[in-house]
Amino acid sequence: MNFLIDNPLSPRVAIGLRAAGHDAVHVLDYGMHAATDEAIFGRAALESRVVVSADTDFGTLLALREVASPSVILFRTASLRRADDQVALILAALPSTEAALRRGAIVVLERHRLRLRDLPITRQREENG
């Protein structure tokens, strides 16, 4: 898979994913360390990359935009700060989430929990559950 690692995460996450055979770049690799969330979304969509972040604003942005790409993987727990742990969690989740991520999804990862939601997030889907 192709990943774009957001600034809140270490560049070592991209290195770990590349070591596992994935195409992964960190926003620093593009000189986007101060880029807006919109700019990061645009780059990820242009290159068919999954955004990997700890920035929960991406979930809100997806809901507001009502689009199916880019897909996003979010870390939601402070206990997962080590890059090695984050890489291991992504790799463990991919067998059950890869197809959805390719279609368009947001995946929220915690140490012992995974939540997956298909994109786009629309008002009607929100109201109907």
Model-inferred region functions:
Residues G59-L94:
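Mid-chain, well-packed structural core segment of small domains
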Residues S96-G129:
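Charged phosphate-binding loop/patch that engages nucleotide di/tri-phosphates or the phosphate backbone
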